C-alpha cells in the first residue's frame, strides 16, 4: 500500500544566493618592507603576544639600512682617511724640521685617536654579539621543526663553546652520550635544551631569586624612598650584567644600554597581562594584610619587578627559545619572597624588642 503524496509547498520569497567572499588585491613587498616583516605564529593567544614582542625585539636589534646611514658611513671613512694622511704628513714634516714638540703632540694625538677607535670597535663587537644572539634563536626555532641531520649538533656545540662549557662538563657529557646517529636536528636540539641548557638556566634563576630577595628586603626595612630607588636601579643593572655573563655575552656601554632598553620594551608590551595571568588569582586568594605589613607588601612588589626584569633578561640572552614548561613563572618567585620575608621580618622585630 503506497503512502499518499504530500501537498506541494510554495515559497513566497526567492532563494538567496550565497555571498561570495571579497578577495583583496595582490600586494607586493619591497626590500625595506620585507626586512620589517615577521610571520605570525599559529599558536595560542598567550603565545601570539610573545611572538609579537619577539618580532619587535628582532626589529629593534636589526640595524636599519638607509641611504643616509650609508652616506654618513662613507663620510666618516673619508674623514678618517684624511686625518690619517694629514697626521703622516705632520709627522714627516716635524721629523725633517726636528720640531720635537709638534712631533710629540702629533704622536699623543694619534695614540688618543687609536684608543678611541679601539673602544668603538670593541663596543661594536659586543653589540654585534648581542644582535647575533637573536639570530641564533631564530636558527634554533628553525632547527626545532627540521627533520634534517647534521646541523643540530654543530649548532649546539657552538652554543656550548660560547657558554664556556668544556668537554668535561657533566651536562655536556650526558648530552653527547644520549646522541645517536638516527637523531635528526630537532631531536638533537631538544636534547641539548633538556640536558645542557638547564645548567645555565638554574644559575640564572638562582641569581634572580637572590637579587629579588635583596630588593624586597631593602624596600621592606628601609624608610628612605630615594635610597630604595637608587639601590633597586643599581641592583637591577647588576642583575642584567650577571645574567648576560652567565650566557656568554660580554656587555659594553652601548650593548648594556641596548639590552636594558629591550628588556623594558619587552616588559611594557607583555608585562601587565602576564603579571595578572601568573600572579593575580593566586595573589587575590590570600589575605596579605593579615600576614605582612604594608611595607612588606611593597617589598614583595619591588622583588617581583626585579624578578620580572631578570626573566626577560634571560629570554633575551638565551640562545634557545623557551620550550613547553621551561619558562620561569613569577608565582614561583613570589612564594619564595613571601617565605623569606615571613622568616626574616619577625626575627628583626624580636631582636628590636
UniProtKB/Swiss-Prot annotation:
InterPro entries xref list: DUF697, UPF0283
Chief location category: membrane
Topology with respect to the bilayer: Multi-pass membrane protein
Subcellular location: Cell inner membrane
Keywords: Cell inner membrane, Cell membrane, Membrane, Transmembrane, Transmembrane helix
A cellular-component GO term for this protein: plasma membrane
Bilayer-spanning residue ranges: 71-91, 101-121, 214-234
Family: Belongs to the UPF0283 family.
NCBIfam families assigned to the protein according to its UniProt record, in alphabetical order: hyp_HI0043
HAMAP family (UniProt xref): UPF0283 (MF_01085)
Protein's name according to its UniProt entry: UPF0283 membrane protein YpsIP31758_1791
Organism annotation: Yersinia pseudotuberculosis serotype O:1b (strain IP 31758)
Amino acid at each position: 500500500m503506497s503512502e499518499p503524496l504530500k501537498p506541494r509547498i510554495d515559497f513566497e520569497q526567492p532563494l538567496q544566493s550565497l555571498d561570495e567572499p571579497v578577495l583583496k588585491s595582490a600586494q607586493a613587498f619591497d626590500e625595506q618592507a620585507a626586512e620589517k616583516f615577521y610571520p605570525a605564529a599559529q599558536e595560542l593567544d598567550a603565545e601570539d603576544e610573545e611572538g609579537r614582542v619577539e618580532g619587535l625585539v628582532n626589529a629593534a636589534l636589526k640595524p636599519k639600512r638607509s641611504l643616509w646611514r650609508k652616506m654618513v658611513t662613507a663620510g666618516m671613512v673619508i674623514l678618517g682617511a684624511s686625518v690619517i694622511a694629514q697626521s703622516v704628513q705632520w709627522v714627516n714634516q716635524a721629523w725633517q724640521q726636528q720640531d720635537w714638540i709638534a712631533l710629540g703632540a702629533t704622536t699623543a694625538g694619534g695614540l688618543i685617536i687609536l684608543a678611541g677607535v679601539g673602544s668603538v670597535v670593541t663596543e661594536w663587537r659586543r653589540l654585534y654579539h648581542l644582535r647575533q644572539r637573536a639570530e641564533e634563536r631564530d636558527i634554533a626555532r628553525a632547527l626545532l621543526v627540521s627533520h634534517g641531520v647534521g646541523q643540530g649538533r654543530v649548532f649546539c656545540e657552538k652554543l656550548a663553546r660560547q657558554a664556556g662549557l668544556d668537554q668535561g662538563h657533566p651536562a655536556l657529557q650526558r648530552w653527547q652520550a644520549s646522541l645517536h646517529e638516527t637523531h635528526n636536528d630537532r631531536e638533537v636540539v631538544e636534547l641539548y635544551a633538556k640536558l645542557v641548557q638547564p645548567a645555565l638556566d638554574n644559575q640564572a634563576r638562582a641569581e634572580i631569586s637572590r637579587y629579588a630577595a635583596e630588593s624586597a628586603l631593602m624596600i621592606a626595612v628601609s624608610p628612605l624612598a630615594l635610597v630604595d630607588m637608587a639601590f633597586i636601579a643599581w641592583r637591577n643593572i647588576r642583575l642584567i650584567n650577571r645574567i648576560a655573563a652567565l650566557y656568554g655575552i660580554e656587555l659594553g656601554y652601548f650593548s648594556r644600554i641596548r639590552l636594558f632598553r629591550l628588556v623594558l620594551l619587552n616588559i611594557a608590551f607583555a608585562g601587565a597581562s602576564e603579571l595578572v595571568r601568573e600572579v593575580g588569582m593566586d595573589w587575590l586568594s590570600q589575605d596579605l594584610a593579615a600576614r605582612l605589613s604594608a611595607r612588606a607588601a611593597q617589598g614583595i612588589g619591588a622583588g617581583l619587578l626585579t624578578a620580572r626584569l631578570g626573566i626577560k633578561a634571560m629570554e633575551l640572552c638565551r640562545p634557545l627559545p623557551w620550550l613547553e614548561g621551561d619558562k620561569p613563572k613569577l608565582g614561583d618567585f613570589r612564594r619564595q619572597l613571601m617565605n623569606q620575608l615571613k622568616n626574616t621580618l619577625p626575627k628583626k622585630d624580636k631582636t628590636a624588642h
